[in-house]
Amino acid sequence: MPAPSYSTRAAAHPSPVARKLLALMDEKKSNLCASVDVTTTAELLALVEKLAPYICMVKTHIDIVSDFSYEGTVVPLVALAKKHRFLLFEDRKFADIGNTVKHQYAGGVYQIARWADITNAHGVTGAGIVAGLKQAAEETTSEPRGLLMLAELSSKGAIAHGKYTEETVEIAKTDKEFVFGFIAQGDMGGREEGFDWVVMTPGVGLDDTGDALGQQYRTVDTVVQTGTDVIIVGRGLFGKGRHPAVEGERYRKAGWDAYTKRVSP
């Protein structure tokens, strides 16, 4: 039996952010998230502009931008997201108690809850992290916000698997409107209980198998066939000798072709 399409899932999903994302993916024919780990605002905005037509989402590590300012970095980034129709995912990986993450998410210099449609968290401190982040989002903005839980990682020797992953899924189940999916390596189940998890997978490459710092790459086709909804690609799009627009379309097409295969009868 073929998997349900993004548009079918968008119509019924309990999370406003997931509905928006799945509909946008269907509209742009893209399940590609660009991971833009660059260290200046100029590089960030230029790279996003080149990749924008091919992606459904941009994933940032905003704290590595050395010349960050809200007005100079975030405001133009949000404008690009609106203009080119993609969501913003700040890969913050929150991992503290609820009261602390509430301040980290809403406050400080980055004010993540104000602008990032999506963020993520580890389950190591328990379900309080979900409640704290949701409260911060509700107190900060009327725009929909969504959380991904880190269930599995793509790096060599990662300890996020087995029992840890199972417990993280249980934490995710505590709020299906706010927690809409996982960073994971494939399908996370839950359909028989009424959950429709959106799975996003890093460590996806068409050419490389890994790097010297422990990253392990899997092919686009492999991850999509095992249940991944969004492929997260970084250096494959803009590494040395690569042209972002060319690679953006290449990965977009590979991701969409793999998805089409998955939903075809």
Curated annotation (Swiss-Prot):
Protein residues bound to substrate: 37, 59-61, 91-100, 217, 235
Pfam families in the cross-refs: OMPdecase
UniProt-listed SMART domains: OMPdecase
Listed pathway(s): Pyrimidine metabolism; UMP biosynthesis via de novo pathway; UMP from orotate: step 2/2
One cellular component term from this protein's GO annotations in UniProt: cytosol
Keywords: Decarboxylase, Lyase, Pyrimidine biosynthesis
EC numbers on record: 4.1.1.23
Catalyzed reactions: orotidine 5'-phosphate + H(+) = UMP + CO2
Alphabetized InterPro entries for the sequence: Aldolase_TIM, OMPdecase, OMPdecase_AS, OMPdeCOase_dom, RibuloseP-bd_barrel
One Gene Ontology molecular-function label: orotidine-5'-phosphate decarboxylase activity
Domain of life: Eukaryota
Database matches in SUPFAM superfamilies: Ribulose-phoshate binding barrel (SSF51366)
Active site residues of this protein: 93 (proton donor)
Gene Ontology biological process: 'de novo' pyrimidine nucleobase biosynthetic process; 'de novo' UMP biosynthetic process
Family designation: Belongs to the OMP decarboxylase family.
Protein name: Orotidine 5'-phosphate decarboxylase
Species, as recorded: Diutina rugosa
Lineage: Eukaryota, Fungi, Dikarya, Ascomycota, Saccharomycotina
